Amino acid sequence: MSEKLQKVLARAGHGSRREIESIIEAGRVSVDGKIAKLGDRVEVTPGLKIRIDGHLISVRESAEQICRVLAYYKPEGELCTRNDPEGRPTVFDRLPKLRGARWIAVGRLDVNTCGLLLFTTDGELANRLMHPSREVEREYAVRVFGQVDDAKLRDLSRGVQLEDGPAAFKTIKFSGGEGINQWYNVTLTEGRNREVRRLWEAVGVQVSRLIRVRYGDIPLPKGLPRGGWTELDLAQTNYLRELVELPPETSSKVAVEKDRRRMKANQIRRAVKRHSQVSGSRRSGGRNNG
């Protein structure tokens, strides 16, 4: 049975459907020696030859693939791009290397935003999770600078007009702070560019800190350091797949217990290092005072 070319490539882990549509339109994809066009359909057979930028790529049936998902704690200062011409750090720099597949980011976070960013090897899963029609919840912890009153909160809940259309928070909950520096937890069901910041700016309030803490029911893992990643287990992966009406996986490549032990070992090493630094400074201080 034939399928759209971009769907086949996305499922095989060569990018999100949106990314693949762009490279097809740019004439970078060929099928059996002919330049592909957007809308072309292919049937996956052993003799099928698909090339991207002249390089022969693997297109295996989805049944042969194992969907993998990473939870990454993006720090501020990293770009959501594979390569930066200026050599700045990107979210892909620290991810584990793959053979025969690649990590696809589920959405984006702007350079000054930190927190949970999901990656998957399944382009179709990434595409569906990002699509606005799925209305997958994203939760953010936001520190704002400015006067926030009931009228502004009401506007943010009911909706304000942005340059790319109306927008609103699904929920807003005060979570601490005093004066003009306050924390709120907010949720959205779409991922427009800088939407959280633009919503607050629309009511005259600046965002001074922004952390994504949840995607769907997947929270930012406790104990995960900034720049660290952990791979989701089979139950969490299948939760995401079922959320967007994809068939569940029956096996996983992740050794979850090994991953948890690695996180725990890293925490212990950091604690030992801090203790050694404190002890050393105390001894040094004692000698100076003597």
Swiss-Prot record:
List the GO biological process terms.
enzyme-directed rRNA pseudouridine synthesis
Enzyme Commission code(s) on record? 5.4.99.22
One GO MF term on file is: RNA binding
The active site of this protein is located at: D110 (nucleophile)
Q: Where would I find the S4 RNA-binding domain in this sequence?
A: 3-75
Q: Pfam families, alphabetically? A: PseudoU_synth_2, S4
Region Disordered, as annotated, extends over: 251-290
Query: Which EC class, in a word?
Result: isomerase
PROSITE patterns, sorted? PSI_RSU, S4
Q: Which reaction does it catalyse?
A: uridine(2605) in 23S rRNA = pseudouridine(2605) in 23S rRNA
Q: Which domain of life is it from?
A: Bacteria
Q: Does the keyword rRNA processing apply?
A: yes
Q: Which UniProt keywords apply?
A: Isomerase, RNA-binding, rRNA processing
Q: Output the Gene3D superfamilies linked to this UniProt entry.
A: Pseudouridine synthase, RNA-binding S4 domain
For this protein, the record's SMART domains field holds: S4
Q: What does this protein do?
A: Responsible for synthesis of pseudouridine from uracil-2605 in 23S ribosomal RNA.
UniProt similarity note: Belongs to the pseudouridine synthase RsuA family.
**Protein name, UniProt field:** Ribosomal large subunit pseudouridine synthase B
